[in-house]
Amino acid sequence: MPVMDIQQIWDILPHRYPMLLVDRIEELEEERVVGIKNVTINEPFFTGHFPDIPVMPGVMIIEAMAQVAGILVLSSIPDRKNKLVLLAAVNEAKFRRPVVPGDQLRIEMKVIKRKSTIAKMNGVATVNGLVVAEAEMMCKLADRTDRV
């Protein structure tokens, strides 16, 4: 049973179709989260990437990782309706295997360091236990009313 279903994810993240890239949260701890993205042929990016050989763009995998990280950060904040988590940096991104329609992307994000409005995390995305991508990222907590 998921820790968060899509309804609960909608309550935390501002993203909606076609940019919402998290279907459920399976594990949620203070410094760690595991999210799932079910990759289907209906994803809009498959129309052009690539028409005859659909492969999920690496940048979309990074975005899915950032959204899972955002859920970790926002889940512990009481006034989260007034907050956004912005991606501030991506380092050491590596793409090991292609992600294709039918894959279930399992994303694990762990906090390395956290300050008042900044969180640095390591992330690993897997399909069937095989690493498909990994990255270190930094997220910034901001007010929704701030100009970004």
Regions found by a protein language model. Name each.
Residues 25, 56-79:
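Active-site helix/loop of acyl-thioester processing domains in fatty-acid/polyketide metabolism
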Residues 23-26, 91, 96, 108-112, ...:
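Conserved positions in beta-strands of structured domains
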Residues 2-24, 138:
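Flexible, low-complexity linker/boundary loops enriched in proline and small hydrophobic residues
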Residues 10, 52, 95-97:
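Beta-strand-rich interaction surfaces with strong enrichment in secreted/lumenal proteins
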